[in-house]
Every structure is written in C-alpha cells, then in structure tokens.
Amino acid sequence: MRRREFIAFATSAIFASPRVFAQQSGKIWRVGFVAHRYEKFYDPLFAGLRELGYVEGQNLVVERRYAEGHAEHFKDIAQELVKLNVDAIIVVTTPAAMAARNETKTIPIIHPAAIDPVGTGLIASLAHPGGNVTGLAVLNAETSAKRVELMREVLPGISKGVVLWNSANPANSLAFRETESAGLKLGVKLLSQEVRSPKEFEAAFAAISSQHPDILIVVQDALTLEYRKEIIDFTLRNKLPSMFVGKEWVEEGGLMSYGDRLPERYRRAADLVDKVLRGAKPADIPVEQPTTFELAVNLRTARSMGLALSPAFLARADLVIE
C-alpha cells in the first residue's frame, strides 16, 4: 500500500484556547450523535473532541443513537435527543439532519457529510446557512463527472452502467441526476437502481445482474457506506468493475474510488462542534467544502477482474493496494 500526501479541508480560525474553555467551563457537555451504525471513520470526530478538551467520562457525555439502516427511526431518535436537551446534535446523513431540524430550531445541528444541503432545504446558502444547521458539504457535479471519466479511461468500451443509490435520502436525487448526466455526456447510459433500506439490497443486486451492466457506480451516503461489505462482495462475485467515493471501499476490496477523505471530514467536524458549544451560531458558520480529492485503486481486484491498468494511470493514484 502506498499513499501520497494530500491536503485535507482548508481550516478556518476558531476561538482561542478551546481546550482551556472546555476544561475550565465547569460544565458537563451532552452531545447527540446519530448514524445508521458505528463506523471506525467516525473515530476522528471523537478524537478531535478530546484534543479540544471534551473528554467522555469527565466533561462530555455522548448520546449515541443508531438507526441500523432504518431511516424511519430518525424521527424518534431526534425527539429523544431534544427531550434530553443535548447541547448539540451531530448527524451523518441527511434524513437524520432533517428529522432533527424538524424537532428543534434551537439546538445546533452539525452535519459532516451534507449532500446538496441547499437543495434539500437544510440551509439557506453555504456561506450563510441560517437556522440551526451547519457542517461540511459533499461536492457532486464535478466529482460525479470525474468518476465516470475515470471508469471510461479504465474501460474505454463501456456503454451501459448502473448507479446504485439510496432513494430514501432526498439529497441523493441530485447525486444520481448528476452522475446520469455525466454518463450521457461521455456516451455511457447509466440506469438507476434504488434501495431504501438494508432489506432491499439483495433484490437490488439481482436487478443489477439482470441488466448485465459494464460498470457499477455507487452513490455514497450513510446507508450505502455502512453496508459497503455487502455491495463490495456483490461486485467481486460478479467481477463487476465498480466506482466508489471513499478509499474505505477500496481498502476492503472495491476496485476504485474518487473523493475526499472521511477521517479528515469528521475531524474537522469536531472543530465545528467546539464552535457551537462555545456559543457560535450555526446560522453564522459557513458550510465548508473539500478542496482536494484522492484516487484509490485496488490492483488485486483489478487483476481478478481481468483489468490491465496502465502504469500512467496507476502513477496518478494517491493510494494503490497491491
């Protein structure tokens, strides 16, 4: 495995001495954390909070709640956290963010992976969010086009593919449309395959197989990300060349990914949590965007699929798993 240095999110100045504030305020902070299930790439968020002086068991209580792939549970989770009067709510998927915002207009909500937050109505604009939601946005148009371009570079003869996406997440509609549009511009027809819950994956896999696509592109959100093992196993069984967003997929056997790095995204979210705990209003905290992206390739998977990747292509990759 080799990795090239790359720059994470551009950071902005925060209030001075956050550790001193967190440790000397005398307050026990209570923060909600909402996801489908635990993932290791969330750890930098909590490590970042510790670095900033918020230590679980001392001055921080984290109320972790997991929906286990069932988005309909987010409403009850949000209501519970509001009743607990938490100081902030961290959400990792748009349906959870919308559920939380529907339950409270005062508790700060931090969304580290917001897809089209303006289009979904979570915020008014990236520069001036308004309301009680802020976080980090996911770029779609540019990166969606780049993923299709990379797949066509590896497989120049492709004409048909499938996009797997979670339609229960309203933010993903834009991600699918932009991916579909990018494919059309490159002469690749991309068909839609929706899932809305974990129980729908097997039927989705069967439907994809029946289409006999040249490639698969997966729209990443909390559901697809947290069920990536099942998706990767499907692509390996069927020798289906696939493109993902984060290197986590490639490290676990996926062919290729292009996107920003999740650990840095969640570490940066800790700084935003610190800001709101210190009194900053989410309405006044600009939603940040990634500035640098990485290409990851699993060479073992490529070989198992009979793909010969050129030295020039591999030289451009930030991460190559031999």
Residue ranges and their predicted role:
Residues 1-322:
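Short hydrophobic alpha-helices and adjacent helix-cap/hinge residues
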